Each structure stands twice: as structure tokens, then as C-alpha cells.
């Protein structure tokens, strides 16, 4: 029997179920992957509005990931919402040590409106965090913040 490959989803919690860890887990299951996760933030939001974002404490985030890494043979990492520079710096340390594929899906805004990342941290993400990805997959709204050029595919 083949064991499922394991991916680590590092993202936020969307209580409306439209994004974040919930959709990463669903997508992983669709592709017959086992998804383990670490929460970057919790949000209070609906499909129409982001009311509040509460970043995970860095110490807690680090402990969670350290235990996942020790107990799991990861095949890859998928990163979504990174709410601040502190979490980003911790993720950089982690992905630099693992040497596995990393997909970063930069998320700056909630679907219903509201920012996930402040302007100062956005510059850090663009200049120092995104270069650590194997693949960067911004949606069309996020492309301008990454300073990449969008290419249409038909």
C-alpha cells in the first residue's frame, strides 16, 4: 500500500469556509495528499467583510511547526496568508532548512474586503519572503503587489 504524500499548509482560518486552511485541506484531499497545518492567524469574517484578524503568536506558531516537522515526512509546503513580518521570518527559517518544494499563494485581501497585511510588511514579503518560493501563485488582484507581470493563458 502506498502512503499518501504529506503537505504542510501554512495559512489563516477563514470561518466562512471559502479560503484558508479549509480549502487547502479540501484541495489536498482531491489530489490524494494528506494535509497537516499550521495557523498563521484567526479571522472574524463573513463572505462579505473582514472584521478582525488576530495573528498567531510566533512562539506558538514555531512550536506547532517544529512538532509537525519532527513527526512527519513532508513532501511540500503551501503558504497562504502571512499576516506579519514576524511570522514570515519564522517561515523563512523553516523553509530554508527543509529543502522541499514551497508554493506561496500571496493573499493580501479578504474576498469580502479588508486587508490581511499592512503596507510595511507587504514590502518585506515582496522583497525578502517571496524569493524563497519554488512557485509563486498570486491571483490577478495580488500581482501588482508582488511587482510581477501577469501573463494570461488561454
Spans of features found by a protein language model:
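A conserved, positively charged/aromatic
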Residues: 129-130
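Single conserved hydrophobic/aromatic residue that forms the stacking wall/gate
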Residues: 147-154
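Small-residue (G/A/S/T)-rich helix-start motifs and N-terminal tracts that mark the onset
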Residues: 1-75, 149
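General structural feature for long, well-ordered alpha-helical segments within catalytic domains
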Residues: 6, 57-64, 84-91, 121, ...
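Residues at the N-termini of beta-strands
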Residues: 75-76, 135
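A short acidic, helix-capping loop that chelates divalent metal ions and anchors anionic groups
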Residues: 43-51, 110-115, 144-145
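Non-cysteine beta-strand/loop elements that form the S-adenosyl-L-methionine
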Residues: 36-39, 103-105, 133-140
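Glycine/small-residue-rich loop that forms an oxyanion/phosphate-binding "nest" at active or ligand-binding sites
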Residues: 76-95, 101-121
Amino acid at each position: 500500500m502506498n502512503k499518501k504524500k504529506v503537505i504542510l499548509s501554512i495559512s489563516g482560518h477563514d470561518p466562512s469556509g471559502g479560503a484558508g486552511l479549509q480549502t487547502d485541506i479540501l484541495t489536498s484531499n482531491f489530489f490524494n495528499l494528506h494535509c497537516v497545518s499550521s495557523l498563521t492567524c484567526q479571522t472574524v469574517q463573513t463572505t462579505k467583510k473582514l472584521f478582525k484578524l488576530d495573528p498567531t503568536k510566533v512562539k506558538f506558531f514555531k512550536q506547532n511547526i517544529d512538532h509537525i516537522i519532527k513527526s512527519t515526512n513532508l513532501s511540500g509546503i503551501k503558504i497562504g496568508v502571512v499576516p506579519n513580518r514576524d511570522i514570515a521570518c519564522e517561515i523563512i527559517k523553516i523553509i530554508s532548512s527543509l529543502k522541499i518544494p514551497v508554493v506561496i499563494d500571496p493573499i493580501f485581501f479578504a474576498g469580502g474586503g479588508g486587508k490581511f497585511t499592512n503596507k510595511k510588511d507587504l514590502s518585506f514579503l515582496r522583497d525578502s519572503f517571496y524569493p524563497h518560493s519554488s512557485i509563486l501563485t498570486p491571483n490577478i488582484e495580488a500581482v501588482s503587489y508582488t511587482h510581477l507581470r501577469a501573463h494570461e493563458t488561454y
